A protein has these predicted regions:
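Surface-exposed, charge/polar-rich loops and edge strands
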Residues: 1-41, 45-178
């Protein structure tokens, strides 16, 4: 089965540095097939016979720790499941508008997106939109006023940031086609 691993918080402001070519090699050496990486933010596509995504995430965390000596949260989703999720996107999400920033927030096991949403609170209605779908939340906000958006302020705070990983609409569209 084809999967996507989304690593949380790597290669940001010089922290948690992971080389994508080295990560690709590590995945391949540990038995994953047809490994590809996309961008420097920790997007890894791979194939494996395992069907338990929790086991896959644990295996990947162990590979990262063994190879890079970093404890990195990992979200795993099948490529088909991600395609299905994107097909359920609300009409306001994923537009080509340069004024709006479209993201998908994934809750990393064992957390649920409902728990994350409860901790963050209501979105700022005039600045951002949120719609929960499965264990993810479609989220869009005004680029110019992002600092005032409630979800923007809280997604990186302690107690919430480690529960999630976020990707843009454009990144996810590219990944599902790889």
């Amino acid at each position: 089965m084809r999967y996507i691993a989304l690593l949380r918080g790597i290669n940001i402001s010089g922290k948690n540095k992971i080389s994508m070519p080295e990560l690709k090699i590590a995945f391949s050496e540990k038995g994953f097939a047809d490994v590809k990486t996309y961008l420097n933010s920790g997007n890894v596509l791979f194939s494996d016979d395992e069907t338990d995504i929790v086991k896959l995430a644990e295996r990947i965390r162990a590979i990262i720790f063994e190879t890079f000596h970093l404890e990195i949260p990992v979200f795993v989703i099948s490529q088909d499941e991600l395609k299905g999720l994107l097909s359920k996107a609300p009409s306001w999400w994923g537009s080509d508008s340069k004024d709006i920033y479209d993201n998908l927030i994934f809750a990393i096991a064992p957390y649920s997106i409902e728990t994350v949403a409860e901790k963050i609170g209501e979105p700022s209605s005039e600045l951002e939109k949120v719609e929960i779908c499965g264990n993810a939340a479609f989220w869009a906000f005004d680029r110019k006023l992002y600092a005032k958006a409630n979800w923007w302020k809280k997604t990186a705070t302690p107690g919430i940031g480690e529960m999630i990983t976020i990707r843009t609409a454009n990144t996810l569209r590219k990944i599902v086609e790889m």
